[in-house]
Amino acid sequence: MQIFVKTLTGKTITLEVESSDTIDNVKQKIQDKEGIPPDQQRLIFAGKQLEDGRTLSDYNIQKESTLHLVLRLRGGIIEPSLKALASKFNCDKMICRKCYARLPPRATNCRKRKCGHTNQLRPKKKLK
């Protein structure tokens, strides 16, 4: 049977496959046609990422179905909870109005001697 693989660039690849073929086999065929290594390929069908060991019939992929090819990200993304933690650590600070020292969020006086341990503090401006 014939299926289509659409890339992010909009290019459509036509593949000749069987319903018993595994996702690994499909990725190998894409590599043969496009030169993209299978470990960098992610195939999406009906909003689901296809797992390597499963077959096309497991996902109910029939003739003339369209799969979407997405390349795997090289780096990682920051998990939302880690992003919030990093933001709290880096952005929740007080700033001395005289010497611009970065101080803990609950500080009431500056720790530096050059400004005379002033109590003129402001919160650090948030990133946009």
UniProtKB/Swiss-Prot annotation:
Keyword Cytoplasm tagged: yes
Cross-link Glycyl lysine isopeptide (Gly-Lys) (interchain with K-? in acceptor proteins), where in sequence: 76
Coiled coil: none
Segment forming the signal sequence: none
Record-annotated Ubiquitin-like domain positions: 14-89
Pfam families: Ribosomal_L40e, ubiquitin
Keywords: Cytoplasm, Isopeptide bond, Nucleus, Ribonucleoprotein, Ribosomal protein, Ubl conjugation
Recorded superkingdom: Eukaryota
Linked residues for Glycyl lysine isopeptide (Lys-Gly) (interchain with G-Cter in ubiquitin): 6, 11, 27, 29, 33, 48, 63
Any one Gene Ontology cellular component term annotated for this protein: cytoplasm
GO MF terms, alphabetically ordered: protein tag activity; structural constituent of ribosome; ubiquitin protein ligase binding
One Gene Ontology term from the biological process aspect of the record: protein ubiquitination
Note: Ubiquitin is encoded by 3 different genes. Crp-79 is synthesized as a polyprotein with one copy of ubiquitin fused to ribosomal protein eL40. Crp-6/ubi-3 is a polyprotein with one copy of ubiquitin fused to ribosomal protein eS31. Ubi is a polyprotein containing 4 exact head to tail repeats of ubiquitin.
Similarity remark: In the N-terminal section; belongs to the ubiquitin family. In the C-terminal section; belongs to the eukaryotic ribosomal protein eL40 family.
Record-given protein name: Ubiquitin-ribosomal protein eL40 fusion protein
Organism this protein belongs to: Neurospora crassa (strain ATCC 24698 / 74-OR23-1A / CBS 708.71 / DSM 1257 / FGSC 987)
Gene this chain is encoded by: crp-79
